[in-house]
């Protein structure tokens, strides 16, 4: 499915859009654009499609195409590529406690990071007991892959300098990963 078809499905099926807000992916936040105007290092365009509660922006990169890379631009000046397409980006958003948690430490062999993410999920479940059921509902409705194996891809994507947002003043955003 093309990115635009996926976005249309989210907009058309209100329960999906509302549930994605709980996962900190809110299409309504795109109405006002990102906290500051950003572009790709090569001058390429970034189109905001959603935002998160911290003021961060999810942006499609480059010229219109069936599937476009997804860049995250955080409100604290951190950002970068998170996925090759919207479906993979949504799998990360839905399947992980947060992108910030998933990029908070080096991936290494992945064991320490997976342990940290499991702890974060347990904390979330204390206030949101339906977390796993809601994840399954969204994966099924949107045809999202399981997040297993996506962590390494997220870390590799975030290291790609070609997608690091640049402000209007020419300031390059900090990497998302440590």
Where do the PLM segments sit?
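Compact, glycine/acidic-enriched structural inserts
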Residues: 71-115
